[in-house]
């Protein structure tokens, strides 16, 4: 086997016939500016070939489920192992998928609870046990040798028989005696007396003396089995002459309740055996939404936390509840957020003293009254106002049957564990003490669980809980979870290709991520990472830089070699090398912009926020920082953005919990959240249509003499509408043929040969270029072309795309092929191109995603251009290059999850760097130092 992966003549996308060698079993980073060809080399060449070879080695039956990848365009690739790609995508859209199921930790927890879980009665709190013959023998052996005892079985009359018939049947089976009314009697004597209808009669199975000999123990086991059989799973031991009795039951019951025996299916919310019957294992139902009924949890019942009980008429329900609350010591002056779960249940479902009442004051009864009055319009409106997707009232969001809650390990149920942040869960397992038998049975399972929890901690996800939905994770979080799953599977001899695993990761956790990648390498794998993070580049064994620029100006290998040897490459045309050597830097601003106007959020307590007060300056660049899970998104996306939207009279989701918003709100006319979601709702949308440049291009072609002569309007030059587009492929340029045993074949359309338009439309040209030629130009090429021919309107609309570093993408590039970071920058370009004069707050969520140092420099220039026009920039960011250039920093923390949500530091970057409690400040200090 070759000691390196050798790629010869790669020509995928913009790669210029490059030759690359990647040492096997190393940690390699592929770097370069956006659009230089990194992903073309890593994913479209390396991964495509590794996956293709692996899939083609399988049977045709297996291939139909896997699909097949096309062979990448290159001369050859040698020494490539099976490839696994871990991308920044939220792969699971399944509403049942959680962090626990994705990492397989939950599967091991289910098995652990099924194997060593102990069931406890919710009534007495005593452990529920199912006895066996072994328990009977153990009890007998606690007595001294020679002690006499009797094995008894309670008599259960079979259906259709009388007690007399049952006893006669026992006589025929060879049984002689019974125990009734504290006395032993012969069955025939008892039958002769004629008093058979007694309440409780026991059948004597055997009379024995305590002895530890094998024969006696074997006889005892046989007798116990017979007693369990005849007694319907129940039996007794009576020791003589004291008549001390011990009861045994093979039934799993206690306190009059029959319990379900623990099994892995009992703890599965994907199985009917374990799923909550009300919500079918989803944890949520359509019903009355608690957050809408009680939006402000800092208020008490007395202060009016239940908003549907406001108003002259509805207030009677509040007063009714308060009158009854004293009987059960309900704390009417306690804020709702401080009530116990039991007290909340009383408010929602009824007080214990009203248990048997036909009418009772509680929220459930109130809404039953509203539902019964739906024929009145005001009640229909009220019901609609408070209805939403809410937590299941039966399982309280745990998704499991109540029976699962009774099974515990170390005093905790499986529901308790999945609601703990991973960091606390790992500590709990480290402290868990088990008896010798449970330790032996659960040893392997505990090892797997602890290892996987440690992997999650190592990649900075200690703030997540195992019941967190997979589809609510960011792309970076999803990728790191998949990385943990890969480590847990312990594959060896594979090629792992990762796409920017550092996305969304604060500087503190980058070191941990590097260790995880090294662990993956140490297992015997080759790790290739497409990355822009400086620390990860410096930690790599091997560095490949693709460039020097983007698009047609990229696609070359401008540096390759040991990452430690870059000092010998001074004066390189590689931007990566120049930034790593300090030959080029992003300068710290000489001064910070002053500000007077601001918006204040009071008492923010959504998710883990601790009722904090935060000031957001206007007309400057503010960055919200903090470790993952510290509350940044809750503060900005969950509270500030929807609050401002509502204040401006725009429709949006309800903001999270907070006390109020104040300040210079009227100084803003608009608020825009620039996220990484795809541009446009149609897969046919492209950057040119989004920035409105394509409208001007279509107008230009419609003005040409041939168009005038043929009657072609601008609509004819659109591939989205009938008229000028090719009707065979509907303007797609390709025809997709479904293949069962292979991947779908995408063929060039035979009618238009991939040009998307009819021939007579393609005959219309502007300066020797038809509409298809223009759509295939990169942004940079199009600007150059239209500037040369003085089409200033088109140039002006395209220039903003160039300004944000997207000059390498094509005008007609399908929006579905753009990354999240590219989508975000297209939206930024749109706002820059608009030249909006009304003061606007622009909110960005990690805009440096996918950006090289050189691209960040361009991005900062775009931000400064918006601020110069009187707008405000607010950014959620981890990248120190952006943070050091901010005018104001808001640092949340100090950690993630329940250890976050506090305002750790605020002020200029220099002020935050001086704060000893701020982790951001610690790393910022190094960036600000000369």
Model segments located where?
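Conserved phosphate-binding elements of NTP-dependent enzyme cores
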Residues: 1-930
């Amino acid at each position: 086997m070759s000691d390196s992966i050798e790629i010869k003549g790669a020509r995928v996308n913009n790669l210029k016939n490059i030759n690359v060698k990647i040492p096997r079993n190393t940690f390699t980073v592929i770097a370069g500016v956006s659009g230089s060809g990194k992903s073309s080399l890593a994913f479209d060449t390396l991964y495509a070939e590794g996956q293709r070879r692996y899939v083609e080695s399988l049977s045709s039956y297996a291939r139909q489920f896997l699909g097949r990848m096309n062979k990448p365009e290159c001369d050859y690739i040698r020494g490539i192992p099976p490839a696994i790609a871990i991308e920044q995508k939220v792969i699971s859209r399944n509403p049942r998928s959680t962090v626990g199921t994705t990492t397989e930790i939950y599967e091991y927890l289910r098995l652990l609870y099924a194997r060593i879980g102990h069931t406890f009665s919710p009534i007495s709190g005593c452990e529920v046990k199912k006895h066996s013959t072994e328990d009977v023998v153990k009890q007998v052996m606690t007595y001294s040798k020679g002690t006499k005892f009797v094995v008894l079985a309670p008599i259960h009359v079979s259906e259709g028989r009388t007690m007399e018939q049952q006893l006669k049947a026992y006589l025929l089976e060879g049984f002689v005696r019974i125990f009734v009314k504290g006395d032993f009697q012969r069955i025939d004597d008892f039958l002769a007396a004629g008093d058979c209808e007694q309440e409780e009669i026991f059948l004597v199975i055997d009379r024995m003396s305590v002895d530890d000999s094998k024969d006696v123990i074997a006889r005892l086991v046989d007798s116990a089995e017979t007693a369990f059989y005849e007694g319907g799973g129940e039996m007794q031991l009576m020791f003589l002459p004291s008549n001390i009795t011990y009861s045994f039951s093979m039934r799993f019951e206690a306190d009059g309740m029959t319990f379900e025996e623990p099994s892995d299916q009992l703890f599965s919310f994907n199985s009917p055996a374990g799923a909550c019957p009300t919500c079918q294992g989803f944890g949520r139902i359509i019903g009355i939404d608690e957050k809408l009924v009680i939006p402000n949890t800092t208020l008490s019942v007395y202060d009016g936390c239940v908003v549907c009980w406001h108003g002259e008429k509805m207030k009677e329900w509040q007063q009714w509840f308060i009158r009854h609350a004293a009987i059960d010591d309900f704390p009417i002056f306690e804020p709702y957020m401080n009530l116990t779960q039991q007290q909340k249940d009383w408010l929602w479902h009824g007080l214990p003293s009203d248990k048997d009442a036909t009418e009772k004051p509680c929220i459930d009864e109130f809404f039953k009254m509203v539902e019964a009055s739906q024929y009145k319009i005001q009640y229909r409106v009220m019901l609609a106002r408070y209805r939403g997707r809410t937590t299941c009232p039966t399982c309280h969001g745990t998704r499991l049957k109540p029976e699962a809650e009774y099974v515990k390990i170390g005093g905790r149920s499986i529901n308790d564990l999945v609601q703990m942040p991973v960091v606390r869960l790992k500590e709990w397992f480290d402290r868990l003490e088990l008896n010798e038998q449970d330790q032996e049975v659960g040893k392997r399972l505990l090892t797997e669980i602890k290892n996987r929890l440690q992997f999650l901690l190592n990649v900075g996800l200690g703030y997540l809980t195992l019941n967190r939905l997979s589809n609510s994770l960011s792309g970076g979080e999803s990728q790191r979870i998949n990385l943990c799953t890969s480590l847990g599977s312990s594959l060896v001899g594979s090629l792992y290709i990762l796409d920017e695993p550092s996305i969304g990761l604060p500087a503190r956790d980058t070191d941990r991520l590097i260790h995880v990648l090294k662990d993956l390498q140490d297992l015997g794998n080759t790790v290739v990472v497409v990355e822009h993070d400086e620390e990860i580049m410096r930690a790599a064994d091997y560095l490949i830089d693709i460039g020097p620029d983007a698009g047609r100006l990229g696609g070359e290998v401008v540096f390759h070699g040991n990452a430690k040897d870059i000092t010998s490459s001074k004066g390189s045309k590689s931007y990566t090398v120049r930034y790593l050597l300090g030959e080029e830097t992003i300068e710290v601003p000489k001064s910070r912009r002053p500000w007077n106007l601001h918006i204040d959020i009071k008492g923010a307590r959504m998710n883990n926020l601790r009722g904090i007060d935060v000031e957001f300056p206007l007309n400057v660049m503010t960055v919200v920082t903090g470790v993952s899970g510290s509350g940044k998104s809750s503060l900005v996306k969950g509270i500030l953005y929807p609050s401002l939207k509502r204040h401006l009279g725009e429709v949006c989701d309800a903001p999270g919990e907070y006390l109020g918003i104040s300040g210079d709100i009227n100084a803003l006319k608009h608020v825009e959240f620039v996220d990484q979601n795809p541009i446009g709702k149609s897969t046919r949308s492209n950057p040119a249509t989004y920035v409105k440049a394509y409208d001007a291009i279509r107008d230009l072609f419609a003005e040409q003499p041939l168009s005038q002569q043929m009657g072609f309007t601008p609509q004819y030059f659109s591939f989205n509408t009938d008229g000028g587009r090719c009707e065979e492929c509907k303007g797609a340029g390709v025809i997709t043929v479904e293949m069962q045993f292979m991947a779908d074949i995408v063929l060039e359309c035979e009618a238009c040969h991939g040009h998307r338009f009819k021939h007579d439309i393609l005959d219309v040209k502007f300066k020797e270029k038809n509409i298809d030629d223009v759509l295939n130009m990169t942004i940079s090429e199009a600007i150059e072309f239209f500037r040369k021919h003085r089409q200033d309107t088109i140039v002006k609309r395209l220039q903003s795309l160039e300004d944000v570093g997207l000059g390498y993408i094509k005008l007609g590039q399908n929006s579905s092929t753009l990354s999240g970071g590219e989508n975000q920058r297209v939206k930024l370009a749109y706002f820059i191109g608009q030249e909006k004069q009304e003061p606007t707050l622009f909110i960005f969520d990690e805009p440096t995603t996918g950006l090289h140092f050189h691209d960040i420099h361009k991005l900062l220039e775009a931000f400064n251009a918006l601020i110069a026009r009187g707008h405000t920039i607010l950014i959620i960011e981890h990248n120190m290059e952006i943070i050091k250039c901010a005018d104001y920093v808001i640092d949340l923390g100090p950690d993630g999850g329940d250890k976050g949500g506090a305002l750790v530091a605020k002020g200029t970057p220099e002020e935050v760097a001086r704060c000893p409690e701020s982790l951001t400040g610690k790393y910022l200090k190094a960036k600000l130092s000369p």
